[in-house]
Regions:
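Active-site region of glycoside hydrolase catalytic domains
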Residues: 2-44, 88-89, 98-480
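Active-site-adjacent substrate/metal-binding segments within catalytic domains
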Residues: 22-101
């Protein structure tokens, strides 16, 4: 047996979000997914939308007790803009929502769970999209800052750990490039402006936080989905493609958030292509002077890039980042076949080393990492528990590489699994389950999976023992 131990104050937890768990109960405003489901239910797996989700709005006390049983010492969730704010222009609050979030935060604390709060998790109020164009319009940035300010004033007495956005690049790519989030546009120039506006919104929220924060332990950051980009080969065209993919997918928000400036090479490329965002010197100064205190990193799978399918100078298509790179599926890659994602735990080590080397070893944590599997009922044992050994193996492998990085000086301070309880996952709905806790979406019955008991033991020991069987599997290529 090989034993690996993590730091004493390590965050062992899970991540989720308001729109994926709460349900639409007593919400005055719809977010973009509420609206999308109303208008286009056929886009969602089995036409299951966010109306009920996992019923956290009604069941949060019982749900949090289950999270405690799973050993979580910290949980990241989000406050829904569309729930908390009554008047989106004025930024006034809905008292029922204030009472709800106060009760949730208090319940976490009463159960020994650290509440980690994110402000924006893909859930823009749809009225702001239809009236102003959403994140394409800088007026919406100001409304977001009003929302953020209300959150800080209402909850910072008990919440020390804040994040501005979850995966802003997904908002850019899903809504404005690749049509997997509403409004389903394909507009490269607009996508670039949305990326800039999201970053400016984050920086302004950070500025506001530091202006009004009275909590001596208060810190604020951003959660980014970071996946190393590996070239398909050592051919110079593939190496160049992977480099530009990394500039766009990772360095854009990472550099602006941590270093206070956008990557010079990317700015030059976007300027050359005549799609550069509209900015002012004053805005760029705000970004420069309001860097994150810490970083959340979501990692699920690596990215692999090859030279583009068409000439970068082609006029046959409007501007897309894909004019510089194409995705590549490596032959023989180890796959989660249910999700279609490659499993490559070593990339987490490489992310850690990149942060250590190129981003001043800023404090960070794994804010999401998880494995989505469909039809988990096939793994039910005779006692009605899902024996998700595949998830345990997945967690162990990623922790092995994360521990290696920490031993080498990485400033990682936590690991949050996606997710605590099986949750609504946008247009995939409940197709792939990620939780330590299963949910019957018809009865809302919730049950600990085998992985929940594993995770509790992990938390209690702040480490784990890895068997010879683990290393046998670890060194083989196989499919879950």
């Amino acid at each position: 047996m090989t034993k690996i131990i993590f730091p004493k104050e390590f965050w062992w937890g899970a991540a989720t979000s308001g729109p994926q768990t709460e349900g639409r109960f007593k919400k005055k405003h719809a977010n973009i997914f509420d609206y999308d489901f109303e208008k286009n239910p056929e886009r969602f797996w089995h036409e299951i939308g966010p109306d009920m989700a996992s019923n956290f709005y009604n069941d949060f006390r019982e749900d949090i007790k289950l999270m405690k049983k799973a050993g979580l010492n910290s949980v990241r969730t989000s406050i829904q803009w569309s729930r908390l704010i009554d008047d989106l222009e004025e930024g006034t609050v809905n008292q029922d929502a204030v009472d709800f979030y106060n009760a949730v935060i208090d319940e976490f604390i009463a159960n020994g769970i650290r509440p980690v709060i994110n402000l924006h998790h893909f859930d823009l109020p749809v009225d702001l999209l239809h009236k102003y164009g959403g994140w394409t319009n800088k007026h919406v940035i100001g409304l977001y800052v009003k929302f953020a300010e209300q959150c800080f004033k209402l909850f910072s007495d008990r919440v020390s750990d804040w994040f501005t956005h979850n995966e802003p690049m997904v908002v850019v790519e899903g809504g404005y490039l690749y049509q997997f989030h509403y409004p389903d546009l394909v507009d490269g120039k607009l996508a670039v402006q949305v990326a800039y506006n999201l970053q400016l919104a984050s920086s302004l929220a950070i500025q506001k936080f530091h202006e009004i924060n009275q909590n001596p332990n208060g810190k604020i950051g951003i959660v980014l989905n970071l996946s190393p980009n590996y070239p398909a080969s050592q051919a110079k065209e593939d190496i160049a493609a992977a480099h530009i993919a990394d500039l766009w997918q990772n360095q854009l928000f990472m550099d602006a958030s941590v270093k206070g400036e956008f990557p010079k090479e990317l700015v030059e490329l976007l300027t050359k292509d005549k799609v550069i965002w509209e900015s002012t010197k004053e805005e760029l100064a705000i970004i420069k002077n309001n860097k994150v205190d810490r970083l959340g990193v979501n990692y699920y799978h690596p990215n692999r890039a090859q030279k583009p399918y068409y000439s970068p100078n082609s006029l046959a298509v409007d501007w897309l980042p894909n004019k510089y790179f194409a995705n590549y599926q490596m032959h023989g890659a180890r796959m989660n076949v249910d999700k279609g994602w490659e499993i490559y735990p070593r990339a987490l080590y490489e992310i850690a080393k990149n942060i250590q080397k190129n981003y001043n070893n800023i404090p960070w944590f794994v804010s999401e990492c998880g494995m989505g599997v469909s039809n988990e009922e096939r793994y039910l044992n005779e006692d009605g528990q899902i024996d998700d050994d595949y998830r345990i193996q997945f967690i162990q492998e990623h922790l092995y590489w994360l521990h290696q990085a920490i031993e080498e000086g990485s400033s990682c301070f936590g690991f949050h699994l996606w997710t605590a309880i099986d949750c609504f996952s946008w247009r995939n709905s409940y197709r792939n389950r990620y939780g330590l806790i299963s949910v019957n979406i018809h009865t809302q019955e919730k049950t600990l999976k085998k992985s929940a008991h594993f995770f509790k033991n992990l938390t209690e020991n702040s480490g784990l023992e890895l068997s010879e069987e683990f290393f046998d599997k670890f060194n083989k290529t196989f499919r879950f």
